[in-house]
Swiss-Prot record:
One of its GO terms (biological process) is photosynthesis. Pfam families: PetM. It is a single-pass membrane protein. The keyword Transcription does not apply. It comes from Synechococcus sp. (strain CC9311). Disulfide bonds: none annotated. This is Cytochrome b6-f complex subunit 7. InterPro entries: PetM_cyt_b6/f_cplx_su7. GO terms for molecular function: electron transfer activity. Signal peptide: none annotated. The chain crosses the membrane at residues 9-27. It comes from the Bacteria. Its main location: membrane.
């Protein structure tokens, strides 16, 4: 059970920065 929680935490720690970086990149591309 602990491994499942750890896995979910890792997924969030990876997806959140990637999502923020992707959103910033899209805004920068739209700005141009």
């Amino acid at each position: 059970m602990a491994s499942e929680i750890f896995g979910i935490a890792v997924v969030f720690w990876v997806l959140i920065p990637v999502g923020l970086a992707g959103g910033a990149l899209l805004l920068k591309l739209q700005g141009d």
